[in-house]
Amino acid sequence: MKLQAVMETLQRQQRARLQQELEARQLQQDSSEGRTPPSVGYPGNGSEEAEPEALKIQRAQAAALAAMRAAAAGLSQQPSPAASDEEEEDGESMASDEEDEKERDGESERYPDMGSEEEDLKGKWDEDDFEDEGEEDDYEDMEEGMGVSEAGRVGKGSTLPPKHPNPQAFPTQRSVGAERAGLPHTGHPQLQDHGDWTYEEQFKQLYELDGDPKRKEFLDDLFSFMQKRGTPVNRIPIMAKQVLDLYMLYVLVTEKGGLVEVINKKLWREITKGLNLPTSITSAAFTLRTQYMKYLYPYECEKRGLSNPNELQAAIDSNRREGRRQSFGGSLFTYSPSGAPSMLSSPKLQVSALSLGGVATNGSSLSSMQKIKKEEDSPISLTVPPRIPVSLAGHSMVAAQVAAQAAALEQLREKLESGEPPEKKMALGTEEQQRLQRAIQHNLLAMTAQLPMNIRINSQAEGRQDSAVNLTTNGTNSISMSVELNGIVYTGVLFAQPPTSASGTSKGSSNRTGSIGGGSSTSQAAPPPAPSAPTSNNPSP
């Protein structure tokens, strides 16, 4: 902005000085015309003098352009007396040229306003040249925008009369700018051609992967078929940083019986080796299947008819279900505490079933779903019959309980997989379920000394308020229990009983004190006494 302001000031000073000199010359011209006849205004050879006048105008414009460029180049320095003298000399030369133009205007009355128009045109040329200088300085810094700036300069020059005697100035500037930038004149079409070349090169590589004469015939037929089908092949798939050989993929799959057979028999490893692809590629089977379905399966159905889309979908669904069965639960229960028995270290678990002893409160059973949570808040949901819901915290409790379940269920699974009659399998299943319940109860009681346990049970019976059960361990063989029902809190202690019989129970008694609406009671119970109302039973089936 400062540079532009200085330029405008300089232009105004030069114009004022030129105007003064022109007025002085005009007075002298008027005095000389008073002594000579006015026949000069209509010369017989006017056409011959018109051409030199046009050349004078062009020279004047060129001189003005040179003066403006010199002024723009010296703006960063302080104006010196010598520079001012040069500017005055340039101004005088421009004044003489302007005087010639004025004389021509005086001789021809058809163009009375030519002088003012010439000054306006010169002002416009000066401003445009100043902008051109700024753009030329940025040539090397604006390589990509070179074409746009050049087009803008040509557009400006086309709106005004030619100011240079050499009309090839702009093409020369463009060529120089192109050499500086190191880019051709048509940069964007060059990029587009490069993209087309890459696209064609991929097809060329696909055609030239080997010398099989059937390759070209197959690829031509495939591409024409996909084009007619409305799904043209717009790009060649890339796998392992190389072009995927669609021809060999089609040959290998059809030799195996088609895509459905390859999926059902899991033959993708052989096809991967046949394509000379690295065996270390992750999900190579999925990638090959999806690429085959996209580019080759419609062609297979049309030409060979080895399968149909319904069979393909069924094969994919079956493969997905098998994958889920194989990966279910195998790695979820591998954690085993150091102090756990060796029978609890089996990592296999394929059937989830867990039932714990229920707590009967005034004849009403509390039932819900059970969720076991680790400290990382990763839930493991286990299917539970209508029994007590338990929420445990801690790695040891979770691992021990799940490991005990896994050990019992592993034995159950091995027996069920042995070819025994269904009736015997059902009987064994019931027996193993009972054994599992007893093992879980035993392990829960054995672990109370290692890990504090807080069990809260919520249930809502019909016509009753929420009930809650809190269990807290006090030692190795006792559990403090607190039950809140209809606003009344019942507390007691449950003692462990050796599992000598299947129907053995752990009994505790509590004395009820308090009032309805939030009363609390505290009781001390001993193992032998008979239970009193309310009772808390933990039967094992």
Swiss-Prot record:
Residues 452-473 are annotated as: Homodimerization. Gene3D superfamilies: ARID DNA-binding domain. Residues 103-112 have a biased composition (Basic and acidic residues). Residues 55-73 have a biased composition (Low complexity). It is found in: Nucleus; Cytoplasm. One of its GO terms (biological process) is regulation of transcription by RNA polymerase II. Residues 407-501 form the REKLES domain. Residues 497-504 are annotated as: Important for cytoplasmic localization. Disulfide bonds: none annotated. Residues 17-172, 499-541 are annotated as: Disordered. InterPro entries: ARI3A/B/C, ARID_dom, ARID_dom_sf, REKLES_domain. One of its GO terms (molecular function) is DNA binding. Residues 408-450 are annotated as: Important for nuclear localization. Keywords: Cytoplasm, Developmental protein, DNA-binding, Nucleus, Transcription, Transcription regulation. SMART domains: ARID, BRIGHT. Transcription factor required for smad1 and smad2-mediated responses to TGFbeta during mesoderm induction. This is AT-rich interactive domain-containing protein 3A. It comes from Xenopus tropicalis (Western clawed frog).
